[in-house]
A protein has these predicted regions:
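N-terminal Rossmann-like NAD(P)+-binding domain of SDR-like oxidoreductases, especially those catalyzing
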Residues: 1-99, 183
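Residue-level signal for the nucleotide or nucleotide-sugar donor/cofactor binding architecture
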Residues: 9, 17-20, 66, 108, ...
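A short, amphipathic alpha-helix embedded in the catalytic core of nucleotide-handling enzymes
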Residues: 25, 82, 113-120, 147-151
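A short beta-to-alpha transition loop/helix N-cap that caps and shapes the active-site region
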Residues: 48-50, 106, 176-177
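C-terminal structured domain segments across diverse proteins
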Residues: 58-60, 71-72, 93-94, 115-129, ...
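C-terminal substrate-binding subdomain of Rossmann-fold SDR/epimerase-dehydratase oxidoreductases
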Residues: 101, 121-198
Length: 198
């Protein structure tokens, strides 16, 4: 379940999907003779939110202040436990991949900045932006995806020990504010998006 606000509305569904879903996938994978590598893609929201200025490191504590984030932290812990308890002994490579603020690729889910801007343009509505000055590590979906595929290949070929957790993100200087993204999309369109903070 990939949506933060939805996790507040449906916490049981969120935990059931993200926690037990992970358990069921890993259990099925370890019993399938053909599986040789697993990459569980979670999120950069899996960390205990420290509100500090630098990026999180792979060995920082898991946490989360909301059902979505904490469920993804749990998925990470489950993956680590399965890797150590079962998968390593069975020769299955296991890694988790964490990326945040991925854009592009046809993601039209609710509460996604770029789709919300496009919808507001089409419907000529005022867009409500929660936190316009928040700085986010924006990246196009193909950027982390190429990393996930490379990680899966290395796990499969056993080229090196890449099992464990991996963060995928842009360089620090490429992180931009929500407002910056909204303004760039406004500039690209003949109509402007009127936005207000809420």
């Amino acid at each position: 379940q990939p949506l933060v606000r939805h996790s507040y509305q449906e916490p049981v569904e969120t935990y059931s999907t993200n926690i037990m879903g992970t358990v069921h996938i890993l259990e099925a994978s370890r019993r399938a003779k053909s599986v040789r590598a697993i990459v569980n893609v979670t999120t950069d929201k899996c960390y205990e939110n420290k509100e500090w200025v630098w990026g999180y490191r792979e060995d920082d504590p898991m946490g989360g202040h909301d059902p979505y984030s904490s469920s993804k932290g749990c998925s990470e812990l489950i993956s680590s436990a399965y890797r150590r308890s079962f998968l390593e002994a069975e020769g299955i490579g296991m890694a988790t991949a964490r990326a945040g603020n991925v854009i592009g690729g046809g993601d039209w889910a609710q509460d996604r900045l770029i789709p919300d801007i496009i919808k507001s343009l089409e419907q000529k509505n005022v867009l409500k932006i929660r936190n316009p000055n928040a700085i986010r590590p924006w990246q196009h979906v193909l950027e982390p995806l190429s990393g996930y595929l490379m990680l899966a290949e290395k796990l499969y070929l056993k080229e090196s020990d890449v099992s464990g957790a991996w963060n995928f993100g842009p360089n620090d200087e490429d992180a931009k504010t929500v407002k910056w993204i909204a303004e760039k999309l406004n500039f690209a369109n003949a109509d402007s998006v009127k936005s207000k903070k809420y």
